[in-house]
Each structure stands twice: as structure tokens, then as C-alpha cells.
A protein has these predicted regions:
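Beta-propeller domains
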Residues: 19-95, 101-105, 113-139
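Aromatic- and glycine-enriched pocket-lining scaffold segments that form the walls
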Residues: 140-162
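Bacterial Sec-dependent N-terminal signal peptides
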Residues: 1-23
Length: 162
């Protein structure tokens, strides 16, 4: 009986699929990785060029939505979004941006940006609505300051209640 239960559990995991918001990464000099198939696939079509901070987000199926170096936001076609330039992050910041889904509006995302350490821009946020511009997204609020000065570090943790 234990063997049957164990085999059932093993087979069941094949039917489970995780959400793939982090399945695609863009970084460095036009580089990227696609983890949708399990093993990483090299991508060479990215638009950003940064030595340090960047952020990427995909939808729950692993399709690229947008990415940023903290200054420019590129859509899934690797073009700058409308209003997507001039964010107050810095690509020399170790964590220039982090993208967080809006908890109440599934088509909106926060981009939190960090300036270089002890610079005047500090931590800011902008809001992307991915339903605009034919599904490619648009920045609807930009560079709303949270705190200054600040360090170059950003992180986010999903709350236990979802």
C-alpha cells in the first residue's frame, strides 16, 4: 500500500505546474535566460545593457511581460514602453529595480527603483498597466518618491495571505 501511495504522489507531481512569473530573465549586455522548459535556454534579444541591477517579470504561463534596468522599461517586444524612460533607478545600483504585482489589480505592477547608494533619488516606485498599449503596457504613474537617501538594495516577500 505504501508503494502505491508513493507512486501516486510521484505521478501527481507531474500534473502540478508552478506559476512562471520568474521564468524569463534579462540581464547584462542584451542577454537573457528562458527557464520555461526546465533547462535554461540562452536569449540574445534583450534590449538592456547593464552590469548590475535589472528586473524581469512574466505572466503565470511564463510569457515575458516587461523588464527594466531601473531607468527604462521595455515591453515584451523589446521596445521602451510609453512613458517608460526616465525612471529614477540606476543601472549601477546592485538592485536597481524590483517588480511586484499589484495585489488588487491583476493588470498592474509596481516597479520599485533604487538609486546608487547615498544619491538624492532614493527609493521610488512607478506603476505599469499591462492592459494598455494593446497589451504591451504603459507606465501610468512614475517616480513617486518613498524615501531618500537610501541604500542600493531592494527585496520583496509575498505575504502569507496571498
Amino acid at each position: 500500500m505504501k508503494k502505491i501511495a508513493f507512486c501516486f504522489l510521484l505521478v501527481s507531481f507531474n500534473f502540478l505546474t508552478a506559476q512562471k512569473e520568474a521564468a524569463i530573465w534579462y540581464f547584462g549586455e542584451n542577454a537573457g535566460l528562458d527557464f520555461n522548459t526546465g533547462a535554461p535556454i540562452t536569449l540574445l534579444d534583450g534590449a538592456l545593457n547593464t552590469r548590475e541591477g535589472c528586473a524581469t517579470i512574466s505572466d503565470v504561463n511564463g510569457s515575458l511581460l516587461f523588464y527594466t534596468d531601473g531607468i527604462t522599461v521595455w515591453n515584451s517586444n523589446h521596445q521602451p514602453m510609453p512613458n517608460g524612460t526616465g525612471l529614477l533607478g540606476d543601472p549601477s545600483s546592485t538592485q536597481s529595480a524590483i517588480i511586484v504585482p499589484h495585489p488588487g489589480i491583476p493588470t498592474q505592477f509596481y516597479i520599485f527603483t533604487a538609486d546608487k547608494i547615498k544619491e538624492v533619488n532614493g527609493i521610488n516606485y512607478s506603476v505599469v498597466d499591462i492592459s494598455l498599449d494593446g497589451g504591451l503596457g504603459d507606465i501610468i504613474q512614475k517616480n513617486i518618491q518613498l524615501v531618500t537617501p537610501s541604500a542600493e538594495k531592494l527585496t520583496a516577500v509575498k505575504h502569507a495571505n496571498g
